Design a protein with these regions (language model features):
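Conserved acidic residues
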Residues: 11
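Rossmann-like AdoMet/SAM-dependent catalytic core
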Residues: 95-185
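A short glycine-rich, Lys/Arg-flanked "PGG" loop and its adjoining helix->strand segment in the class I
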Residues: 3-7, 20, 27-43
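A conserved beta-strand element that flanks and buttresses the S-adenosyl-L-methionine
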Residues: 14
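SAM-dependent methyltransferase
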Residues: 47-49, 53-129, 134-136
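Short catalytic/ligand-binding loop motif for oxyanion handling, primarily in non-cytosolic enzymes
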Residues: 21-23, 54-58, 142-147
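Class I S-adenosyl-L-methionine-dependent methyltransferase module
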Residues: 1-4, 62
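Cell-envelope and extracellular/periplasmic
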Residues: 17
Length: 185
């Protein structure tokens, strides 16, 4: 029944909270991006979310392997990230692959292995497969502040939109009530 539905590719390809798994090695990353290129319509969009590898790398820069950073709220650990890589540099090339971290989320209640995502390198790899970060004006038309950015940028954009149009406050109430720890995660 579904055969041929996206014969020309999908308008939007999405990878939410899983992109980091493809940064284990070059073969895994190249296979993922090739699949994206084959499944995304020419002129289509790719959207993804993950921790910014450079930010996490900098947070863990002075930590030894097995050490990390935790967020405790009311005596309960809600988040932790542990360094599991030995590398001293985080270059914008294929050497940035395989930087393993362990991440704890309260909702999962255990450490899960992930890999740091170097978005500068990822952008170059994506460009090699015909993708490009959309320009700012196109992003704004889609309701985004930029073609690529951090959660903090999106949150600031959201609060600015709600300040301009108070009717949005009801729709986004939960997001607007995030505490500092939730925003950091």
């Amino acid at each position: 029944r579904q055969f041929g539905k996206a014969v020309d590719g999908f308008n939007v390809s999405s990878c939410q909270f899983a992109l980091h798994y493809f940064f284990e090695n070059i073969t895994t990353l190249q296979s993922f991006v090739r699949n994206l290129a084959e499944c995304t319509k020419l002129g289509g969009y790719f959207i993804a979310t993950s921790y910014d590898g450079k930010n996490v790398y900098n947070m863990l820069k002075n930590k030894a392997v097995g050490e990390g950073i935790s967020i405790i709220d009311g005596g309960t650990k809600i988040w932790e990230v542990q360094r599991q890589y030995r590398n001293a540099d985080f270059a914008n090339d294929s050497s940035c692959l395989g930087y393993k971290i362990d991440v704890y989320q309260e909702s999962i209640n255990k450490l899960i292995p992930e890999f740091l995502v170097n978005y500068d390198y990822f952008t170059r790899v994506m460009e090699n497969y015909g993708f490009q970060v959309i320009p700012r004006d196109e992003a704004i038309e889609l309701g985004l502040p930029e073609g690529s950015g951090l959660f903090s940028d999106l949150y600031t954009s959201l609060t600015n939109e709600v300040a301009k149009n108070k009717s949005y406050a009801k729709e986004y109430k939960g997001a607007l009530n995030m505490n500092a720890n939730e925003k950091k995660i």
